Amino acid sequence: VDATWTVPHFEKMLYDNGQIVEYLANLWSANQPNPIFQRAITGTVQWLQREMTAPEGYFYASQDADNFIDSQALEPEEGDFYAWDYQELAELLTADELTQLQSVFYITATGNFDGKNVLQRHQGGVLSTEIEEILTKLFVVRYGTSPENLLTFPPAINNEEAKNKHWAGRIPPVTDTKMIVAWNSLMISGLARAYAIFSTPMYWTLATQATQFILDHQWQENRLHRLNYQGKPTTLAQSEDYAFLIKALLDLQTANPTENYWLEKVIAIQEEFDQFFWSVELGGYYNNSLDNSQDLLIRERSYQDNATPSANGIAIANLVRLAGLTDNLDYLAQAEQALTAFSYVLKQSPQACPSLLVALDHYRFGNTVRTQSELLNTLCPQYLPVTRYQITENLPNRAIAIVCQGLSCLEPAINQEQLMNQLQSLTLSE
């Protein structure tokens, strides 16, 4: 992205898109129901389904920033798949359509990116039907057919295939088709959260298919493996693979708490994670497993967030969530030890480790709502990031839910207003 946020970096990473889906879904649920957020989520998931989902159900890793203009080009050019020459737009569209498009997007004869136009909105808001129809015309130029006729777009897996295969539209960027557990898990979390809010069946289908692929295919000799190339798992998993996968499973459980399938998987994977990565002496998780670090001078325990969250930040929050869902306080003790291990960093450089701060929020304010399944349709779409849900039929007379924090519980809530007030009071009490 440039300094003015006009031109994006055109490379599309799975981990970026998974995080933005979750973030926008949370924004929507936090009393910010801006239609542009929902449109961005919808468009991202459509792209994911169309271009980044393998027939087996997992998600590809990335798409290149550049692509070939034609089969005779020696080198690919950045952003050509997405950018528009002014003369090209003038030939594709009627004069009225071009005028309408210019009223919504910055479009000039000189362009804003190497002489071409990257379509940037003048302002937000809902696009009109007329503008959507014009954008569909441009989609057809890119892909050779309309969106409704293009459910899947097979990837170009290398430059040779990109240049030599017959494409109905423009030559697409090359797609890295390997499966990475950590990156898939970030997208699964985003889809799970979006499903909890919008109840779109496709979000759940995509999330659970990818998850099931990992559960069915990424274990060899009882160990999780990080990568999959064309159906073959390889490379022992790192701490982020375990942490993000466990979070994804917990997010699926949160989106559909009526069954414990995902929670049962979490418990087993957490045990494996602890066995090979947990620092008994210091607390926290090493980046590499015990049996895959013989050549390392130092076994590091990363805490900084970068393009993806820190494994330790996510893992500690997972432990707190697990404690609330299972009533196993050993998980809570682990979380406390890990937070203590990173306490100096939290005090001195909090801006470097926002995921650890989120984990601290879970530890201090995390709560569990015990309720009947009928109330979940109301609770799950709410922005309650440190709340877990347990299904129970054993509620006192007239009660709809019981809110518990740690070993103590509040008085049974008899209506939704009382329940929401209790949850708010817990997060503001300290």
Model feature map: region roles:
Residues V1-E430:
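Glycan-recognition and catalytic cores of secretory/periplasmic carbohydrate-active enzymes
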